[in-house]
């Protein structure tokens, strides 16, 4: 048995070493292409650019308690927890000048899940529970992009703009939902971000980090829902790290 476990550990170690070697080889090969002179020299002068974007997000709700929360002694704690999700988008970039671009995402899907944690006290016994709010959001962001001068095969940029979100799975219209926290379908957010362009021979690789802050109250409050009536306003917050290939 010990020999089998030892062989398994050796096998896993060999696999990790092989994967690491492949990753190092690929990364060194890619970055060597960045040092071979200007790639895609006419890329930035084209009127339009198109790309595919995939991202990873961390999101949570910023909320305020309703006065009824202080009047009750059963629900003693309400918290919003960070959770992860993914983004898939199609990028359309319109050149406005040497340093400015208008960026649109005609198709931008965000898959996320928000979690509320509750602490309830009944007859001296405290219980903890979670309420999850899953969403598939169709977003319509509009960003103004300001770029630095290109240095060989590298460029840095910042973005700022607005985004409208439409939740395809909103539960605001559901009835008899004692266990639900009802959320409205639409939200309007402001966004800022920072990104980097790496120019390769046949494509541009763009990592980007972006912050989103919702402006509208998402909470569709219902006096009859005990997990909802202790909350007043709910605003969305999200940070996204994404990779775009143009």
Predicted regions: what is each one?
Residues 33-41, 96-98, 144-150, 166, ...:
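Outer-membrane beta-barrel proteins
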Residues 31-84, 246:
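Short glycine/proline- and aromatic-enriched beta-strand/turn motifs that initiate or cap beta-hairpins
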Residues 1-44:
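Cleavable N-terminal export/targeting peptides
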Residues 46-50, 82-86, 134-140, 154, ...:
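Residues that define the transmembrane beta-barrel architecture of outer-membrane proteins
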Residues 64-79, 111-135, 168-183, 218-232:
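Flexible, solvent-exposed loop segments that connect beta-strands
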Residues 37, 185-187, 195-246:
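Predominantly the C-terminal beta-signal and adjacent terminal strand-loop region
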Residues 44-48, 56, 60, 91-170, ...:
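Gram-negative (and chloroplast) outer-membrane scaffold detector with strong preference
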Residues 33, 160-173, 187-192, 205:
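A generic hydrophobic-segment detector
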């Amino acid at each position: 048995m010990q020999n089998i476990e030892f062989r398994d550990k050796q096998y896993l170690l060999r696999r990790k070493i092989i994967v690491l070697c492949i990753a190092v080889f690929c990364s060194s090969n890619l970055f060597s292409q960045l040092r071979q002179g200007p790639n895609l020299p006419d890329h930035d002068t084209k009127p339009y650019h198109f790309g595919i974007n995939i991202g990873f997000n961390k999101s949570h709700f910023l909320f305020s308690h309703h006065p009824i929360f202080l009047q009750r002694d059963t629900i003693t704690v309400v918290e919003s927890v960070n959770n992860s999700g993914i983004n898939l988008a199609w990028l359309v970039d319109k050149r406005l000048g040497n340093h400015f671009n208008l960026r649109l995402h005609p198709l931008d899907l965000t898959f996320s899940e928000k979690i509320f944690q509750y602490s309830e006290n009944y007859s001296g016994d405290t219980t903890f529970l979670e309420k999850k709010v899953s969403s598939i959001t169709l977003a319509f962001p509009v960003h103004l992009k300001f770029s630095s001068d290109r240095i060989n095969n590298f460029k840095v940029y910042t973005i700022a703009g607005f985004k409208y979100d439409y939740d395809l799975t909103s539960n605001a219209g559901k009835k008899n939902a004692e266990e639900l926290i009802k959320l409205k379908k639409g939200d309007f957010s402001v966004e800022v971000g920072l990104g980097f362009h790496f120019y390769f021979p046949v494509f541009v690789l763009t990592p980007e980090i972006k912050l989103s802050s919702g402006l509208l109250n998402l909470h569709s409050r219902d006096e009859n829902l005990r997990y909802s009536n202790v909350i007043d306003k709910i605003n969305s917050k999200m940070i996204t790290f994404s990779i775009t290939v143009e």
